């Protein structure tokens, strides 16, 4: 109910904040459906959380992932056949309600979630409730900060530019957020396992696994950023047309944020696994810093300024403040900076060397012109293979990367 109420209030705020919203007919009906759909997802949040905590995340992904695929397929079909956006939103509503009943049925019929009376004192109950309240409050602040960072850019683009820029910017962000969704699924899937691993390990073993995770995700961020740089404009052109592409300079700025969103994942994994959510004000600070610098720079240089503002908040909070807080809790405050640098410095140097090599050879790669989807797939194959080989070859010189690869091979084979 609280989410629904906040959404309605924000809707009225947007009406007065963004002038071009008035040009869209039935805009408040559309907004109401979006808010209702979002609030309904909280109806089964406790069920999906219980399954995830019980290391049944694969069940959650099957329901949510399968539901999403089916919903999107029906939405595309309705848009093509009826051109009715209200029906598009109604499908989302029905899908969320169906998922709620599926989750509820699983929880009610799973013996692991049956309430069994246990001998626990009132003091212990009070302690558990207080700890749970604190962790929920801390998590709430983290989520609010994330929403501020991810969504203020759209509002600022609408305010300082216009809705046509929102369409162009949103098209790129839709592509980039595929990476975020995939990474989030991976984080949720392995967090419980990492938490179990950390319980029985000493500092040296924890340090070793932290180095491996950071090295691998920096390598992955390098690979993703390279492919996005050489392919995203071709994809947008093939998808919705050449008039919707952005300049290479703006694309590079956006990819800096994509790079940061991937290399931050080890920190998120260890934070979720250890439960160190005490840095409750960092996410809010991140949102405020992002809003301030993005609005200030947008006034002078437009869209690049908005993206640079997000980069500034990402660097200050995501890459500096949050990791230092987490590793201070894990290894001691005075060891935090030293540990953090030992995790990221060497792989970042490898990454920048690879970026430099591709930058000076970019003309040869960009020269591959794309005029249809077959050309795009061909270019995708070539760029992906070349970048994968180079990234793997360079990072394989790092012992932590080799250790992680061997660990994966042992699990697979």
Which residues make up each language-model segment?
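Short runs within selected transmembrane alpha-helices of multi-pass transporters and secretion channels
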Residues: 33-52, 63-75, 88-104, 142, ...
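Alpha-helical transmembrane segments of multi-pass membrane transport and lipid-handling proteins
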Residues: 1-20, 33, 77-80, 101, ...
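Helix-loop junctions and terminal segments of transmembrane helices
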Residues: 52-53, 111-115, 176-214, 268-273
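Interfacial/gating helices of multi-pass transporter permease domains
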Residues: 85-90, 127-135, 157-177, 205-208, ...
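Helix-terminus/linker motif at the lipid-water interface of multi-pass membrane proteins
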Residues: 15-19, 77-82, 140-141, 147-178, ...
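Interhelical loop/hinge segments that connect adjacent transmembrane helices in multipass membrane
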Residues: 86-89, 101-150, 193, 201-208, ...
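Structural signal for membrane-spanning alpha-helices in multi-pass inner-membrane proteins
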Residues: 7-15, 75, 79, 103, ...
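Membrane-proximal transmembrane or re-entrant/amphipathic helices at the cytosolic face
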Residues: 331-332, 356-413
């Amino acid at each position: 109910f609280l989410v629904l109420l906040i959404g309605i209030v924000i809707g009225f705020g947007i009406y007065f904040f963004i002038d071009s919203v008035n040009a869209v007919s039935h805009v408040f009906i559309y907004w109401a459906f979006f808010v209702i759909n979002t609030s309904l997802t909280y109806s089964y949040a406790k069920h999906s959380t219980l399954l995830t905590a019980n290391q049944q995340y694969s069940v959650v992904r099957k329901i949510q992932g399968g539901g999403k695929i089916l919903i999107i397929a029906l939405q595309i079909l309705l848009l093509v056949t009826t051109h009715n956006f209200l029906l598009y939103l109604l499908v989302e509503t029905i899908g969320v309600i169906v998922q709620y009943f599926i989750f509820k049925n699983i929880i009610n019929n799973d013996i692991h979630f049956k309430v069994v009376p246990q001998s626990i004192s009132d003091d212990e109950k009070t302690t558990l409730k207080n700890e749970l309240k604190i962790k929920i409050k801390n998590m709430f602040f983290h989520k609010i900060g994330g929403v501020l960072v991810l969504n203020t850019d759209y509002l600022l683009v609408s305010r300082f530019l216009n809705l046509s820029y929102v369409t162009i910017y949103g098209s790129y962000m839709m592509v980039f957020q595929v990476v975020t969704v995939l990474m989030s699924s991976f984080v949720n899937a392995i967090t419980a396992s990492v938490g179990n691993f950390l319980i029985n390990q000493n500092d040296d073993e924890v340090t070793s696994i932290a180095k491996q995770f950071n090295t691998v995700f920096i390598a992955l961020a390098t690979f993703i950023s390279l492919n996005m740089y050489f392919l995203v404009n071709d994809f947008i052109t093939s998808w919705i047309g050449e008039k919707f592409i952005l300049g290479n300079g703006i694309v590079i700025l956006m990819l800096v944020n994509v790079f940061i969103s991937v290399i931050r994942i080890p920190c998120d994994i260890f934070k979720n696994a250890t439960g160190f959510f005490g840095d409750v004000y960092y996410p809010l600070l991140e949102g405020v810093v992002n809003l301030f610098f993005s609005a200030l720079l947008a006034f002078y240089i437009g869209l690049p300024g908005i993206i640079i503002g997000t980069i500034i908040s990402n660097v200050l909070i995501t890459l500096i403040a949050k990791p230092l807080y987490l590793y201070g809790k894990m290894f001691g405050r005075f060891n935090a900076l030293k540990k953090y640098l030992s995790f990221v410095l060497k792989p970042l140097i490898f990454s920048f060397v690879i970026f430099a090599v591709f930058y000076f050879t970019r003309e040869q790669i960009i020269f591959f012109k794309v005029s249809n989807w077959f050309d795009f797939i061909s270019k995708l194959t070539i760029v992906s293979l070349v970048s994968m080989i180079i990234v793997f070859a360079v990072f394989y010189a790092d012992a932590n990367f080799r250790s992680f690869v061997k660990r994966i091979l042992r699990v697979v084979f």
